[in-house]
């Protein structure tokens, strides 16, 4: 059900996001007794509180136009930045992340490892090449894109 809502909201909201903003992700989840619709937006240099207020004024009325109403319960709209650990949900997002430190979770393990964290050296649209630390040694792994369950930027400590 929530994926259907996300798909409907994405179809309505994505075309309305003006340049230079980028729709990064949409999440719909229940937190406690509240439903939260999170619309994650970014732009070069990051977004401000004023940006989120302006975008909320664009997005909120659009959500009211979706018929029939896809939301089974009342929800809170949250427009925000994706933060430091932004999700990398598209091939384009992964291409833009080359050279950055990322976290990748896999559907099935490679060499008994299901989560890799390291520098994304390359992404050709089909394979991610990551330099990661295995104990004290740097290793390189090639990960087929179709085996990626989730990817996001990560903070290197």
UniProtKB/Swiss-Prot annotation:
One of its GO terms (cellular component) is cytosol. Keywords: Cytoplasm, Ribosome biogenesis. It comes from the Bacteria. One of its GO terms (biological process) is translation. Required for maturation of 30S ribosomal subunits. NCBIfam families: PRK00092.1-2. HAMAP family: RimP. This is Ribosome maturation factor RimP.
